[in-house]
Amino acid sequence: MAGRIREAYEHATPASATASHRAARSLPGGDTRSMTWYPPYPLFLVQCEGTRVRDADGHWYEDMIANYGALAHGHNHPALVAAVTGQMTRGTAPGGPVPLQYEHAERLRALNPSLERLRYCNSGTEATMWAVRTARAYTGRDLVVKIDGGYHGTHDWGQVNAFFAPQRTAPARLAGLPEIRPAAGVALSTAGDIVAIPYNDLPAAATVLRGLGEQIAAVVVEPVLGVGGGVPSAPGYLAGLRRLTREAGALLVFDECATLRLGPWQVKHGVIPDLTTHSKIVGGGLPLGVFGGREDVMALFDPSRPHPVHHAGAFGGNSLSLAAGSAALDHFGTDEIAHLDFLGDRLRAGLDAAAASVGVAGRSVGEGGLSYFHFGSTPPRDAADTARLRAGRAELRSLLHLSLLNAGFLTAPHGLLCQHVPTAPESVDALVDAYGNALHDLRPYIAVHHPELLEKDAGHVHRDAP
């Protein structure tokens, strides 16, 4: 079974294989973005239209990943194309203030009013880096509390306990907390300023904030745990962090780079942080990052004040990204968010039903237009649960991913699923059918390698390929 799935993929994608070999002559392993590589080689994409992408062999796929949540409007949306092509004739990055900076900011503040003041950078990585620097400058403290398995980009502190294999470890500051696990290349001295806490564990957060509160500059959290498994925050968890950070005099930072598509989360649920980061959708398909929040905190950057915090960058707030982002925000409001919520709810319900119908233990998690699929009968509550659900199942997950590609669906190897606003409900249903067929076909493999995933009392049904 495993061999047939791989052979079908390789038979259909010889041009991608050739492209991968050529890329490897310039790029390590033929890759420049770790999340998009998978064995035996990734598809090389040459054209995108609407909700579909075409590979180098001419095959079209329904895009169910939306560039890891960075896109919302589909590919080549007419308004975004017009904004970018028009701005190209007026200048891309002129090296001085432009009206687009406050025009885009006004649009974004209308969507997220907690951004009383904001600044621009080039990515979510930069945005979270600057949010923490802002918190440290404002509080005069150094310690940062982050979620074990939380992903905040590729700067040094963001790569501590970020669901990547560590080269070395360090003990936690307090007993009972996760050990500190910096990724390769991150200094232990950097990791020494990080305290990791389990997601959705308010007692652990209370222990840290009450025990180390006077040293803590910020608590940084994703409202939905992203790379750590798509885990939603438990009811009351983020409100509890809000209360605890106020008591400790620390700033609460929401990393909403991925969860703007949910409303953003803070607006939908009414829990307001001190600082927020955004990226992905706000750039309309081009690189753009935002960090901002309380006016008194962001006043540290006011250049008319004595000794402002220095923040610069040749492409921060560049005109091209802001033009695309403004067009994207003009077409991203209540109706679009509600449609993404509808698609996500439909997808998760369908995936759970599909797994049950073929007698395979599998559960979907997520919120709104952000979903994950996991093997196992119980959905994860934190990143440690996600790690346990994935342990020893890398080949199974790879085979499921390749099966979906063979069926014409572009998804993420680690299970992330995101839709575009123009994605049709029928496309979601077709993806659910593809999952069901793939899981059915994988039952013999699962019976040999992962029998614990077969639900023996479930009367699975035969599924004919569409």
Language-model-detected regions and their locations in the chain:
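Conserved N-terminal phosphate-binding loop of PLP-dependent enzymes in the Aspartate aminotransferase
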Residues: 1-466
